[in-house]
Swiss-Prot record:
This is NAD(P)H-quinone oxidoreductase chain 4, chloroplastic. It comes from the Eukaryota. InterPro entries: NADH_Q_OxRdtase_chain4, NADH_Q_OxRdtase_chainM/4, NADH_UbQ_OxRdtase, ND/Mrp_TM. One of its GO terms (molecular function) is NADH dehydrogenase (ubiquinone) activity. The gene is ndhD. Keywords: Chloroplast, Membrane, NAD, NADP, Plastid, Plastoquinone, Quinone, Thylakoid, Translocase, Transmembrane, Transmembrane helix. Belongs to the complex I subunit 4 family.
Amino acid sequence: MNYFPWLTIIVVFPISAGSLMLFLPYRGNKVHKWYTICICILELLLTTYTFCYNFKMNDPLIQLSEDYKWINFLDFYWRLGIDGLSIGTILLTGFITTLAILAAFPVTRDSRLFHFLMLAMYSGQIGSFSSQDLLLFFIMWELELIPVYLLLSMWGGKKRLYSATKFILYTAGSSIFLLIGVLGISLYGSNEPTLNLELLANQSYPVTLEIILYIGFLIAFAVKSPLIPLHTWLPDTHGEAHYSTCMLLAGILLKMGAYGLVRINMELLPHAHSMFSPWLMVVGTIQIIYAASTSPGQRNLKKRIAYSSVSHMGFIIIGIASITDPGLNGAILQIISHGFIGAALFFLAGTSYDRIRLVSLDEMGGMAISIPKIFTMFTILSMASLALPGMSGFVAEFIVFFGIITSQKYLLMAKILIIFVMAIGMILTPIYLLSMSRQMFYGYKLINVQNFSFFDSGPREFFLSISSLLPIIGMGIYPDFVLALASNKVESILSNYFYG
């Protein structure tokens, strides 16, 4: 057990510092913005320092563990810890949240509440990734939903209340299944009920019970990931949310579902996961081609990017379902990779909206000459999204492909069929991404409109774009930077399976 509460400080600091902002006298929007940015930078530096000096990459066990009795009556503990599976997502959360708050500089209405909600969401997300207690994981999972709902309903487009209501109905409804799974898995014990994830990982269950628990957790995580057909909240939410909120949704929130699938479904319920993995493989494959074929029909810019996120999440599901070392490593790399790519694309879509106040691709055109910096960055990040060699998406998808090929669980014809359908999806991806760029930046529609003034990317926007792009290129050139963090944990998880 760790004697200094590093993780507790990292989890509690953002929401605590954000709460102070609500009670301090109003000093103007700029003060609140810079205060929030300083909090995020300090949090990111503290997280990086803690992990650099206290995390051992060759140890697959839980590190920096903290275990404090919280509620005696319920035998409830505040258990935190990290391993190779969670360290990457925690660092991703810190990086994307800092960029999202910097991107939210134009927000002036209810600035104090807006930035407090962003910080509360930050704490909930880090708490979910570092929880080593099932009930604490559930509480953090729910804590993160409240700020998202308020951010959607108060700052967004004309249909923001509809999209916020749809979001909360889907996620709150799925949380019921998560709670049932948490109670079921914790109450069944050989000696006494436990919520400790480390102890639960070494526990076996009757096959029927394991299947029931697996389905409950799967529904909860399938909504958040999202998996088809439980994805319909995502395009509406992204289409109406402020682009800084979209950055957090695409960059972090979707990854929580994939993280839960690995942390709970795959690690705690290996027999059920082995039984359900072929179905997950089918769903992931269909998801890639479904989203890639549906996306070109979306006339709303942000909805089209949202469908690209659905397609990319299909690769993560396939990697998890492959039950192989390369497949799971590729899925983890894709989680980090798409976190940066998705957040960056939504940011650039938002900066375009700030200039022209349009989201319909049919009304756009001809912006490349007036805003060459934004055009260049959007083109590069579109290439990253379609998995151009040299970018992180290419490496992640290639490793997932390799994981399918080397899997001993599936027959040769099944693997050939899966790879063939995935390849079709990858061919469709450039069609909807490049056509999106063509509709936005080429042609003469907006150039011929009078009283339209364009201004190119400013220093803040250019810094945000470059900050998102550099990790994408870095992981594309040297993916071992991410893979080395999780490799030992992946081997530990796969040791519960008889093939791989």
